[in-house]
Amino acid sequence: MYSGKNPSALRSQQWLADSLIALMADKAYQSISVKEICQNADLTRQTFYQMFSSKEDVIRYTIMKGCETFKASLSLYEQVDMETLATAFFCFFREEAALVKLLAENHLEYLLTEQFSLALPEIMDLCTERKKAFLSNPYLKSFIIGGLLNMILEWIKNGDGADVEELALLFTEQFVKDTPENH
């Protein structure tokens, strides 16, 4: 995946990502070709392969950009505790529900887990010190990401309109009650 700073290349990268997501709204991911993505973005296959190695790479890029947006939203808080983290997470995904639904419909949820797991260390840096120490356990990190993402997927799949704060509180009550700082 391209990671340089060239504005033209970055723009092409975004156009290709937007093209794939737009195509996924009408067609299954598996049946979309690189040629179709390029035609829809009005770019060449050569440009595609300069930016990405595969369609999966395009999805990773899209999710990675979302992770960056999420991290930026967390940096606005003075302190990030577990409830703040969960609330911000659900608020972010409420805005990204259409994308998550497309990923779920195409069995690409594992890419959400993969990319948010990669972003978690930076997200944890925004957490309060006591939580940071607690969250350094790799099993607990997996639990948090898995729990939050599966709640997101269930919420979007059901489309039940559950309130963001209600979901964050539900997660926090289940998770926080057994943390070291509460004993």
Predicted segments with their positions:
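Residues in the helix-turn-helix
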Residues: 15, 33, 47
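Hydrophobic alpha-helical segments that form the core
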Residues: 135-157, 161-177
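Alpha-helical structural segments
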Residues: 15-22, 40, 57-80, 84, ...
